[in-house]
Structures are given as structure tokens and as C-alpha cells.
Curated annotation (Swiss-Prot):
Annotated positions of the Phosphoserine modification: S2, S79, S294
Name used for this protein in its record: Splicing factor U2AF 65 kDa subunit
Record InterPro entries: Nucleotide-bd_a/b_plait_sf, RBD_domain_sf, RRM_dom, U2AF_lg
SUPFAM superfamilies: RNA-binding domain, RBD (SSF54928)
Gene name of this polypeptide: U2AF2
Length: 475
């Protein structure tokens, strides 16, 4: 190999080595620049985070701390909350929950009767001096007044619907001005088509009482019979009778008053219209009730009434008492007269010779015999209805009540209260017979019980023949 060739080979090797070194330096420089870019990027990220953190700190410092945490002495403490105090209602003239439909006087009467705990809804004072009313007692609610907000309606038209009944009574209440607030006073109607009666539920106790003024109103040709339900318990201090009179409506309930008349000795064949015609010859009637046998529907021979104009009461007594109707003579007097003016006959040895007598108001120096010839058996009338004797428990309660009261006048030997039987005409059903051990005790009981009230009805009494009583001949 010539020297030239050798020289050229060395040049090529040197060139290859330089190229190799150059490539190595380029790769190293590229990696270095990449690392530099990454370092610069991380540095920018740190600066951005620091800036955001500083910005948050500035925002925190720029507004007051209401909640959250702040750094103090190396610990975290809660900043106090600043909230607006709630306004406490004083409940001035605001009815308690569940009593929206009764008046304040009714509420006070219920509270006085112990139906509402006296301290149950009294406001208590907080340390800040605010009155706070506690949660009402769970038992307090409209259910407590429900029985006082319901009415029984009998003799309803056949096939009548609940909607029609509700519309009729709501309209009558509005026309009569008996509603206490806008809206319908009748909330619900329940009809028993088989037994031809219904129950109405009103929104308030007062409106329920005023609706009783429609007793006897004509609805689709039927005279409605309106009564309180059997479970009714009067509210203390509240009137049980309506304070209004609906013109043209003759109530079938004659409330107790000084102007309530008893008409006895009516022939059994006379119907309501015939007796009314006789009575209205002295003036229009406010209320009238001809007592009938529930089994036969026939008159029992006596009735009660009250006139619209109370001034004609004495005139009716003077004109009707002693009037001959067929083979009977009328006995007309105030219904409560027996309890006040009956004279106790004594001593016992003269009982059979001296009948109980009373002075009838409105008659000129005349006396009428009360209750017939005295015996040991007393008949109490107008105290119970046949349907009230169906339930065994209720029947036993009535017997016990009668026994307890009659025992105050003497020793009670026996009591008979005939009960209704389906499909059978039971003699004396609706009457109560009490046998005493002596005539004298029976007389005392008559004088003490005549004109008294039993189940909100005025008691009428008469003597019963002992032999008929023992034969159970209660006709």
C-alpha cells in the first residue's frame, strides 16, 4: 500500500470519529434542552400555584369570615355564626291547631270541662324573653268535637243522594244567614237508604246547633226529622238549642222552656195535621211533636208544642184545657208544671183518699187531677226511644240510671222497660215502669220526677194499675 493510500485511510477514520463525536454531542444537547424545558415548565406550574394561593388568601382577607376556619397559634378555630333571630308568633287570637272551627268560648268551655289540659298550650318564656307555644297534645284535635258537629236526619226522601242532601242544607244555611264563614258549612253526608236516615257533619259546633232550626223542614215532600246523635255530649256552657227561628218551619223537637205545653187526652185516631189544626187556632206553632207508638205509628194520645208568640200560651191553656174531644177530655198545661206545683200528699194513711192535685196556670180556681189514682207502680214516659233499647249495654245503663234515681224516693221493688222485637208489636215499648214498695214512695217519685229531664227530654208520669203491671199488660 502506497503512502498516499495510507494517508487517505487515516483521514477517513478521523472523519468517522469526528462524526461520531458530533452525533453524541447533538444527542446530549437535545436531552439537556428537553430537561431544561421540563424544569422550566415545573417552575411555571409552581409559580401559577403560588399565584392562585396568594389570590385566594387575598380574597379571604378582603371579606369578613362568617364560617370556615382561620389559622391562629397553629390551630384551627370555628368562627361564630351570625344568623337572624326567628320571629316567634305570639298566637294572639290565633286558634290552636285542630280547633280552627270552634269559637274561643267553646274552647274555654272544653278546657274548663277538662277536655283540654289547662297547661297544654300555655306559652313558655325563653331566656331571651320570647313566648314560645309548645307542640299541642296529640289527643287534641277536631275529633274531640266531631260528635258535637254531627246531626241525625230522619224521614229523608227515598233514593236521595248524598250530594243532593249536602247541596240542600248548604243552600238553606246560606239563605237563613246561619253560616259563620265563606264556603260550605256541611262537610260530609252519610246516608243509610235501608233505614231512611242520614248523618250530616258540619265544620263548626255553632253551625251544627243552628242547623237544628231546620227540624221539620220540607224536602222533596218529606218533613225531615233532625236530632242529635246518640253519642252526643253537650259542651259545658254552650247552648244545645238553636238561637234562631226559621219562619214557616215547625220543628218536631220541642225544647224545654217555660212556654212548652203538654197536651194530654188526645183521641188516638187524630193525626199530626188534625192536632196542629186544633192548636193553631190560637196562633202559629214554633214546634210540635205528637208522640206515637214506634211499632204501630199510632198516636199515644199526648203531644208537646210551643207557640211562635209566647203571649198566646196562657190563652191556649185556658181555651183547650178541659175541652171535650169525642169521649175524652183534654189536659193542657205547661210541661214543667208538675215538678213545681205538685203537692205531696201525706200522711200515708190518707193516700188512697187524697189524689195528687196541681194548680194549672191560666185556669180560674180550677184543679185537675194529675196522674190518676195513686198506686205503687209509676209509669215514666217521654224518656227513651225504642231504638235506644236495642243495644244490651245501653239498655242496662238506662235501667241502672232509672233505678238509682228512683231509689232516692223510696225502695224500688222492680223495674220493667219493654224492648222492641222485630215484627212484633210490643206493648208499652218506649215506656218505663217502676214498682215501689209503697204508694207513698211512688207519690214522692212522681212529684220529684215529673218535668225532670232525661236524655234532654221532659219526663211525663202517670200511675199504673198494679194488677196490669204484674200481668205485663202494658197497654
Amino acid at each position: 500500500m502506497s503512502d498516499f493510500d495510507e494517508f487517505e485511510r487515516q483521514l477517513n477514520e478521523n472523519k468517522q470519529e469526528r462524526d461520531k463525536e458530533n452525533r453524541h454531542r447533538k444527542r446530549s444537547h437535545s436531552r439537556s434542552r428537553s430537561r431544561d424545558r421540563k424544569r422550566r415548565s415545573r417552575s411555571r406550574d409552581r409559580r401559577n400555584r403560588d399565584q392562585r394561593s396568594a389570590s385566594r388568601d387575598r380574597r379571604r382577607r378582603s371579606k369578613p369570615l362568617t364560617r370556615g376556619a382561620k389559622e391562629e397559634h397553629g390551630g384551627l378555630i370555628r368562627s361564630p355564626r351570625h344568623e337572624k333571630k326567628k320571629k316567634v308568633r305570639k298566637y294572639w287570637d290565633v286558634p290552636p291547631p285542630g280547633f280552627e272551627h270552634i269559637t274561643p268560648m267553646q274552647y274555654k268551655a272544653m278546657q274548663a270541662a277538662g277536655q283540654i289540659p289547662a297547661t297544654a298550650l300555655l306559652p313558655t318564656m325563653t331566656p331571651d324573653g320570647l313566648a314560645v307555644t309548645p307542640t299541642p297534645v296529640p289527643v287534641v284535635g277536631s275529633q274531640m268535637t266531631r260528635q258535637a258537629r254531627r246531626l241525625y236526619v230522619g224521614n229523608i226522601p227515598f233514593g236521595i243522594t248524598e250530594e243532593a242532601m249536602m247541596d240542600f242544607f248548604n243552600a238553606q244555611m246560606r239563605l237563613g244567614g246561619l253560616t259563620q264563614a265563606p264556603g260550605n258549612p256541611v262537610l260530609a253526608v252519610q246516608i243509610n237508604q235501608d233505614k231512611n236516615f242520614a248523618f250530616l257533619e258540619f265544620r263548626s259546633v255553632d253551625e251544627t246547633t243552628q242547623a237544628m232550626a231546620f227540624d221539620g223542614i220540607i224536602f222533596q215532600g218529606q218533613s225531615l226529622k233532625i236530632r242529635r246523635p246518640h253519642d252526643y255530649q253537650p259542651l259545658p256552657g254552650m247552648s244545645e238549642n238553636p238561637s234562631v227561628y226559621v219562619p214557616g218551619v215547625v220543628s218536631t223537637v220541642v225544647p224545654d222552656s217555660a212556654h212548652k205545653l203538654f197536651i194530654g187526652g188526645l183521641p188516638n185516631y187524630l193525626n199530626d195535621d188534625q192536632v196542629k189544626e186544633l192548636l193553631t187556632s190560637f196562633g202559629p206553632l214554633k214546634a210540635f211533636n205528637l208522640v206515637k207508638d214506634s211499632a204501630t205509628g199510632l198516636s199515644k194520645g199526648y203531644a208537646f208544642c210551643e207557640y211562635v208568640d209566647i203571649n198566646v200560651t196562657d190563652q191556649a191553656i185556658a181555651g183547650l184545657n178541659g175541652m171535650q174531644l169525642g169521649d175524652k177530655k183534654l189536659l193542657v198545661q205547661r210541661a214543667s208544671v208538675g215538678a213545681k206545683n205538685a203537692t205531696l200528699v201525706s200522711p200515708p194513711s190518707t193516700i188512697n183518699q187524697t189524689p195528687v192535685t196541681l194548680q194549672v196556670p191560666g185556669l180560674m180556681s180550677s184543679q185537675v187531677q194529675m196522674g190518676g189514682h195513686p198506686t205503687e207502680v209509676l209509669c215514666l214516659m217521654n224518656m227513651v226511644l225504642p231504638e235506644e233499647l236495642l243495644d244490651d249495654e245501653e239498655y242496662e245503663e238506662i235501667v241502672e240510671d232509672v233505678r238509682d234515681e228512683c231509689s232516692k224516693y223510696g225502695l224500688v221493688k222492680s223495674i220493667e222497660i219493654p224492648r222492641p222485637v222485630d215484627g212484633v208489636e210490643v206493648p208499652g215499648c218506649g215506656k218505663i215502669f217502676v214498682e215501689f214498695t209503697s204508694v207513698f214512695d211512688c207519690q214522692k217519685a212522681m212529684q220529684g220526677l215529673t218535668g225532670r229531664k232525661f236524655a234532654n227530654r221532659v219526663v211525663v208520669t202517670k200511675y199504673c194499675d198494679p194488677d196490669s203491671y204484674h200481668r205485663r199488660d202494658f197497654w
